[in-house]
Amino acid sequence: MTKLSVNINKVATLRNARGGNVPNVVKVALDCESFGADGITVHPRPDERHIRRSDVYDLRPLLRTEFNIEGYPSPEFIDLVLKVKPHQVTLVPDDPSQITSNSGWDTKVNFDFLTEVLDEFNGAGIRTSVFVAPDAEMIEYAAKAGADRVELYTEPYATAYPKDPAAAVAPFVEAAKAARRLGIGLNAGHDLSLLNLNYFYKNIPWLDEVSIGHALISDALYLGLERTIQEYKNCLR
């Protein structure tokens, strides 16, 4: 079964726009779990423009499903993850100033750095995932570096899907097959939505997890959070 992890960064963005604690990030996360989410994802950035370090500490003891923390492995991020000990850490190559993730790691160029970071997290018993493009070589070096999983960067799929779904998904199917041959787990995320998720899943049914935030929270404005989560879960069947 492919798990749905809900990224709640956009909820924190809304809270921070006004100040105060509305919406309550922790309550929304717990409600997502109650409505069927299999996990919660957060991406704390150094400027805390959405998720704050305090949110991460508040969430950890209360969540009943898997907790995934994603981010660039700066010393501060590594320290946070080792203290919180989530179920999974996802390493992304973001510059702190980026609005959102827009590329995967070059795992060959960054092999030594990633190996060192992954070794630290693996030693703490935290499942590790590395954000990569759908490229067999990048997946191979992620596996060699010690990653338990890779997360495929799916924005190119989402962009190409409306014009030619088969062509859009083809490189991801090949990448997924490469991951399976290497014995490494497979996650996916970025711009997956109700429009394109089911087709992606049908072509790669051995996906372990998808992480979805922006589209899901946007859909919830119209459909409500509970119905939206169920709609996304239905796309993974």
UniProtKB/Swiss-Prot annotation:
Site feature (Transition state stabilizer) residues: 151
Pfam families named among the record's database cross-references: PdxJ
Top EC class, one word: transferase
GO CC term (a single one): cytosol
Record-annotated active site: 43, 70, 190
Protein EC: 2.6.99.2
SUPFAM superfamilies membership: Pyridoxine 5'-phosphate synthase (SSF63892)
GO biological process, alphabetically ordered: pyridoxine biosynthetic process
Subunit note: Homooctamer; tetramer of dimers.
Physiological role: Catalyzes the complicated ring closure reaction between the two acyclic compounds 1-deoxy-D-xylulose-5-phosphate (DXP) and 3-amino-2-oxopropyl phosphate (1-amino-acetone-3-phosphate or AAP) to form pyridoxine 5'-phosphate (PNP) and inorganic phosphate.
Protein name per its UniProtKB record: Pyridoxine 5'-phosphate synthase
Source species of the chain: Bacteroides fragilis (strain YCH46)
